[in-house]
Design a protein with these regions (language model features):
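N-terminal interaction/assembly modules
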Residues: 1-138
Length: 138
């Protein structure tokens, strides 16, 4: 996984990680958010070196609490609408249920942020989540 550049980037990554964890249904969004903000989870990412076959834990910058909470709050308040929008974007014979959970969490967090922060340029938000996706899938 590539290095996270800013606290805002860390906030977005933490939101993706939180929504990924939420998908398992074991904790509420509020419980997960508290664990992230307390530093109990989400302070490191795994940097994989496929050629060497090694994994290293790399610390990330702390999340910016306002953005992190805003994304999660937006998702909690608009989950049905967000998931409907994501499902509607797939071909007729596909649904978000067929999408890997990490990708689904990236789409959910990005959509939640777009809804919560209309003043933030769309290109910035999309670029940030593309970078997050690349860090997981490249």
């Amino acid at each position: 996984m590539s290095k996270i550049k800013t606290n805002r980037s860390s906030s977005r990554l933490a939101a993706v990680q939180a929504l990924y964890q939420y998908a398992f249904g074991e904790k509420t969004i509020d419980e997960i958010a508290r664990e992230f903000m307390a530093g109990d989870i989400g302070r490191e990412v795994i940097d994989e070196d496929e050629q060497a076959g090694t994994e290293t834990f790399v610390p990330v910058m702390p999340a910016e609490p306002t953005l992190f909470a805003g994304i999660l709050s937006s998702y909690a308040q608009n989950a049905d609408q967000i998931n409907e929008m994501i499902n509607a974007s797939f071909a007729e014979d596909w649904s978000a249920d067929r999408v890997e959970l990490t990708l689904k969490a990236i789409l959910q967090a990005g959509t939640a942020e777009l809804m919560a922060y209309p003043e933030t340029p769309v290109a910035i938000i999309i670029t940030e989540y593309i970078d997050i996706a690349k860090s997981f899938y490249s």
